[in-house]
Regions:
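Extended, low-complexity, acidic/polar intrinsically disordered regions
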Residues: 1-826
């Protein structure tokens, strides 16, 4: 370049610099635009350096210009210088960084424009990137200025500034070896950004915090704070945030200093991502975690190689089908095994009051069990109480996940160890639904060979009154799940043990009996289906009942106390009677139990048991009685029913008498031969019941008379009188039964008190009274009345003809006479 050209160029630059300092904003702006174009036209670093030497003071001053456009242009010019320089120029470190600090790095933010703040932070990132070096620490002398800027702007109100700041931090970490000196000062502001409402900010904050922790030395509390702050983001609603948590966790497992001390806190970050809802996240994090395992294997090769020699088979036969993926590598499993101290944190979160936290911790526990396998057995005693509580949770999703975890434990853990602990807790807390559900899932996951040897021990414990006598619907459902498993195992055995069979039978009967407490019949339906499966055949069912029902009835304790109809003991007795009925072997046990209830319990409880007796008597099986039905029924009626049939004052007494009469009627329906012999002995009770206040009692009493055999003459007379009095009963059903009963009422002619004349007079009186009710307005009575008259005509033709002659001659009676004479009613 000629000297004249150079002089012209310098004059132009002097004019340009003068215009940059001009008071007129438009001139300053035009001059800066001209300078920007001039920078891009420089071809060499020497030319750029000369240009910069003439203009840098003016540019630095423009950083503080009162107009935002001027400040923005100055920043753009410096960026262009930075871009065009092939070599490093100390100007950026000596002048620009300190200027930045004064503008955006002080506690009181000088720069008011958010856009300029963002431009300055972006420029800071470019400068750091330009001056990064592996040889000389060029950034060392202005390191504190840069850190002041970064720390201050992490608390900026502007979200974009946060993200630019995080990018600059990541660049600075690799740009200077001195980054570790103040790295811990970034932890607190970065952890605050983890709660930012924008997901992009949360994501880059996690990434930056992960990088910063790699350079923290002798500040373990800061690393712990970082991990604890990141952990809640594992349940973030945005997938990118969760993914970054897993990536940082894997990065820490590989690169973090003293990482072995933090394994129990870092590993959960990775394992939680392995249970993420998105397949892409699970696959990506799994790839990273495999590399972590490989590094851990290499670092502990001598120890793990010995394990590798014997660790080539799956721990259980259906392992792959269970977890739907291949078995984790030995390095990953060893890494998790070394981190089992994390269980303390997981257990604490399993007891948290927030449902998402409990669910999240259970998913994490599932992964820990999967990787730790048998090594987790040593932690089972710590986890089991919290897992049992989770199984009793109000949230169905939590219960479902807790049962999955328990099932996996049953698959992978040492059977004898967890069985000993759970059996101990079942005995200690016999009515705990959570423990029962947890045990059920554990047992379901265990190998069939182990379970076969434990069925009798478990069934013996479950059959006790403390465990089995529970009215809770959820508890009964869980109990049925466990029983179903044990029954299926029992049925696969070639030789069934008698003790095991006895306990399983008792549990099934008790559970079905107690299901009567609920309106929902699902439990009863399941129980009955399982009961039929267990018994196999009706004959075997009868045999099992005869063998074991005495013990079931005797297990119902404290029946000599006052119980209501909702008492577990009353419901149990009612259900047993209803399900199994009567057999000779346990007839006396039922009789004793029912007697205690009728003597001590409330009226409603007595009514419930009597209704159960009615249903049982309707299903009476003579084959089960082995020819002793007459004797057993006589004793039962005399000892149990007859005292209840005696009249007592009060509404409760009326209801009890009604149910007792119904039970007596059921005997008459199912045991007609026995009833013909037994019922005549109850004539005095029946006479009293026929005039009872309750219509239903009167109806059942007359039905009992219909089933009875010949009565003694005096009893017959009183019965005729009482039944005839029921022809005027306010209840039409009672009137119909009375009319039906009169022709069927029998007298014993061999009785010493029997008188033929008196008997004929009674028959005449019966027939004459029946004729009087032919005009009853109740439409159903007339055919019953005519049928009864026809039976009396056939049974006593002479007396009947004499009574017809006494009838008045009118159209009603003439029609009846004609019908009877023509035998159309026979």
């Amino acid at each position: 370049m000629s000297s004249s050209t150079e002089i012209e160029r310098n004059l132009e630059l002097e004019i340009l610099c003068k215009n940059i300092q001009c008071a007129d904003k438009s001139k300053r702006q035009a001059a800066l635009n001209e300078l920007l174009q001039s920078v891009s036209k420089q071809s060499t670093d020497e030319d750029l350096k000369n240009l910069l030497d003439l203009t840098y003071l003016h540019l630095v001053k423009c950083y503080t210009d009162k107009f935002e456009a001027i400040r923005s242009l100055a920043i753009s010019i410096v960026n262009e210088f930075l871009k065009c320089f092939q070599t490093r120029n100390e100007f950026f470190l000596d002048y620009i960084i300190p200027t930045m600090r004064r503008r955006i790095g002080l506690p009181e933010m000088v720069e008011e424009s958010e856009e300029i703040q963002l431009e300055l932070l972006t420029q800071l990132g470019h400068i750091v990137e330009k001056f990064q070096s592996n040889d000389t620490d060029t950034l060392m002398r202005i390191y504190n200025d840069i850190m002041d800027i970064l720390v201050r702007n992490l608390t900026n109100r502007y979200a974009n500034a946060h993200r630019e700041c995080c990018k600059a931090i990541q660049l600075l970490a690799t740009a200077t070896p001195s980054f570790y000196m103040r790295a811990e000062s970034l932890v607190d502001p970065l952890t605050e950004l983890l709660c930012h409402r924008q997901s992009a900010t949360r994501t880059i904050a996690v990434e930056t915090l992960g990088v910063v922790c790699l350079y923290i030395t002798n500040k373990n509390d800061k690393i712990v704070k970082s991990i604890v702050s990141i952990s809640p983001l594992l349940t973030d609603s945005v997938a990118a945030v969760r993914r970054m948590c897993g990536i940082i966790g894997c990065k820490w497992l590989i690169e973090l200093r003293d990482r072995y001390s933090f394994f129990e806190r870092i590993v959960p970050l990775v394992l939680c991502c392995l249970k993420d809802d998105l397949v892409d996240i699970r696959e990506e994090i799994n790839t990273h975690f495999i590399r972590c395992g490989e590094q851990f294997f290499d670092e502990n090769q001598q120890e793990l190689q010995r394990i590798e020699l014997i660790d080539h088979e799956y721990p259980c036969s259906n392992y792959v089908a269970l977890v739907t993926k291949t078995r984790p590598t030995l390095g990953c499993r060893a890494l998790v095994e070394k981190s089992l101290r994390m269980i303390n944190i997981i257990v604490k979160e399993m007891l948290d009051w927030k449902e998402p936290v409990r669910l999240h911790s259970l998913k994490l526990l599932w992964e820990v069990v999967l990787f730790a396998e048998k090594a987790f057995t040593c932690k089972f005693i710590e986890v089991f109480p919290a897992l049992a509580k989770a199984c009793q949770d109000d949230e169905n999703s939590v219960v479902k996940e807790a049962k999955r975890v328990a099932f996996l434990m049953g698959q992978l853990l040492n059977y004898n160890d967890w069985m000993e602990i759970t059996m101990r807790d079942l005995k200690k807390f016999p009515n705990c639904l959570g423990i029962l559900r947890c045990f059920n899932s554990l047992f379901a996951g265990a190998e069939i060979e182990h379970k076969r040897n434990s069925v009798e021990e478990i069934a013996k414990l479950i059959s006790t009154s403390e465990m089995c006598h529970n009215l809770n619907e959820g508890y009964q459902s869980a109990l049925l799940d466990l029983i179903e498993q044990m029954v299926n195992i029992h049925l696969t055995k070639i030789e069934n043990e008698s003790g095991e069979e006895k306990y399983l039978f008792e549990i099934l009967v008790k559970t079905i009996a107690l299901s009567n407490a609920h309106e929902n019949n699902e439990i009863a339906t399941r129980g009955l289906s399982l009961y039929e499966t267990f018994c196999k055949t009706p004959e075997n069912r009868v045999f099992l009942q005869g063998m074991h029902m005495t013990d079931v009835i005797n297990d119902i304790e404290d029946l000599d106390c006052e119980h209501s109809e909702r008492s577990e003991r009353i419901i149990m007795l009612f259900g047993c009677i209803k399900l199994c009925g009567f057999q000779k072997e346990y007839f006396s046990s039922i009789q004793t139990a029912v007697k205690l209830v009728l003597e001590n319990s409330t009226a409603n409880a007595q009514i419930k048991i009597l209704s159960g007796l009615s249903m049982a008597f309707l299903n009476w099986n003579h084959e089960n009685m082995q020819g002793s039905a007459m004797n057993l029924l006589s004793i039962f009626i005399e000892d149990i029913l007859e005292p209840v049939l005696i009249w007592k004052a009060g509404r409760n007494a009326e209801s009890i008498r009604a149910m007792a009469t119904q039970a007596l009627c059921s005997i008459g329906c199912s045991c007609p031969d026995e009833a013909r012999e037994i019922f005549p002995k109850l004539s005095k009770n029946l006479i009293s019941l026929i005039e009872d206040e309750l219509a239903v009692t009167r109806a059942y009493a007359i039905r009992c008379v219909l089933k009875a055999g010949p009565f003694l003459y005096e009893d017959y007379r009183h019965l005729v009188t009482e039944i005839l009095s029921r022809l005027d009963d306010p209840c039409a059903n009672v009137r119909c039964l009375a009319i039906e009963c009169l022709p069927q009422l029998e007298v014993n002619p061999s009785d010493d008190m029997f008188s033929e004349t008196g008997y004929s007079s009674l028959v005449e009186y019966i027939i004459s009274r029946l004729f009087l009710y032919l005009d009853d307005p109740y439409i159903k009575i007339r055919p019953i009345l005519l049928d009864s008259l026809a039976k009396l005509q056939k049974k006593h033709p002479v007396v009947f003809e004499n009574e017809i002659k006494k009838l008045p001659t009118n159209y009603l009676y003439n029609d009846i006479i004609e019908d009877l004479k023509s035998a159309r009613l026979e």
